[in-house]
Design a protein with these regions (language model features):
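Conserved beta-strand signature within the Rossmann-like core of class I S-adenosyl-L-methionine
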Residues: 146-148, 172-176, 192-193, 199-211
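Short conserved AdoMet
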Residues: 167, 201, 248
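Core SAM-dependent methyltransferase catalytic element
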Residues: 256-289
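Short, glycine-/aromatic-enriched active-site segment of Class I SAM-dependent methyltransferases
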Residues: 217-232
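A short SAM/SAH-binding and catalytic strip from SAM-dependent methyltransferases
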Residues: 152-153, 162-190, 196
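Short alpha-helix
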Residues: 234-257
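Rossmann-like AdoMet
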Residues: 1-150, 155-156, 160-168, 276
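Short "lid" loop at the C-terminus of a central beta-strand within the Rossmann-like core
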Residues: 179-182, 211-215
Length: 289
């Protein structure tokens, strides 16, 4: 993208500051007694925003599959590499769906290192994540970042609200990192990806990371069962073929859909243990209306 697209439906001064918009539609009810994915991941990342229920599940999963911590950290490294690579291709707008509790090295920080004018919209539907949004939203004055309380299942609403900050007539990178595993097969995760892709301009991108049991079927199955027995939203591990199919008719960039630790790795991201996730990035060609 050679030029910064004009803001839509907001004055220029609105982009000089960050904001958190609560739709009042879909925020998950706060329940500290039931383990939640965002808080469990925060525990695995060494954060402080979790409760005993989250730690209990997190510790049991770690006992059954110790590599989970390396995998969660590898997913953050994957995020960083994806955003940097797409920024190098000229992308200046990012839609990060299922962002989770804010951590250092978030999407807007990485994108605005490449170009301070970059715009980012974070999407989640968890009340604790929403409560932390203002701490996350510290955009530089030349760019913008916003937080949207929305559910991936309602792609129409999500895209309409995101268009307050992002110009969908220009390239946008949609990040779906470790979020589609929270959607069961009957929720049609691949169909949701297609709906998002169809709304994007040519030269936009879809990035996906997703858990798998391909590398250690027994331990991952046991860890998944323990997690699903206690967590608010269960997860589904999928095969390489199933995850690749989520890209629909889009062609992933080289090296394809691969273990996330080998997707354009940096030396600093080298990990001694494999991560139980595949990842890939695909480019849109043309709108499909």
């Amino acid at each position: 993208m050679s030029e910064e697209p004009a803001p839509k439906r907001r004055g220029a001064t609105a982009f000089m500051r960050s904001s958190a918009r609560d739709s009042g539609r879909s925020t998950a009810r706060f329940d500290p007694h039931t383990a939640h994915a965002a808080r469990i991941c925060n525990f695995w990342l060494g954060g402080k925003d979790h409760f005993p229920a989250d730690r209990e599940v997190g510790e049991e999963v770690m006992r059954l599959r110790p590599q989970i911590v390396a995998g969660v950290r590898a997913n953050r490294c994957f995020l960083r590499r994806v955003v940097r690579h797409l920024a190098s291709r000229g992308v200046r707008q990012f839609l990060d769906i299922g962002t989770g509790i804010p951590v250092l090295g978030s999407t807007h920080e990485i994108a605005q290192e490449a170009d301070p004018r970059s715009r980012v919209v974070y999407v989640d539907n968890d009340s604790m994540v929403l409560a932390h949004a203002r701490a996350l939203l510290a955009s530089g004055p030349e760019g913008s970042c916003d937080y949207l309380d929305a559910d991936l299942h309602d792609t129409g609403y999500l895209l309409r609200e995101a268009s307050r900050t992002l110009d969908f007539s220009q390239p946008v990178a949609v990040l779906l990192l470790a979020v589609l595993q929270l959607i069961p097969d009957d929720g049609n995760p691949g169909g949701l990806v297609t709906e998002l892709a169809n709304a994007l301009a040519p030269a936009s991108y879809i990035a996906i990371s997703h858990m798998t049991a391909d590398f250690a079927p027994g331990p991952v199955a046991a860890a998944t069962a323990a997690y699903n027995a206690a967590a608010a939203v269960p997860v589904t591990a999928r095969t390489h073929a199933q995850i690749t199919a989520m890209f629909g008719g889009l062609s992933p960039l080289a090296p394809g859909v691969v273990p996330i630790t080998v997707w354009r790795p940096d030396i600093a991201d080298s990990l001694p243990q494999p991560a139980d996730l595949y990842g890939g990035v695909a480019r849109t060609v043309a709108r499909r209306w």
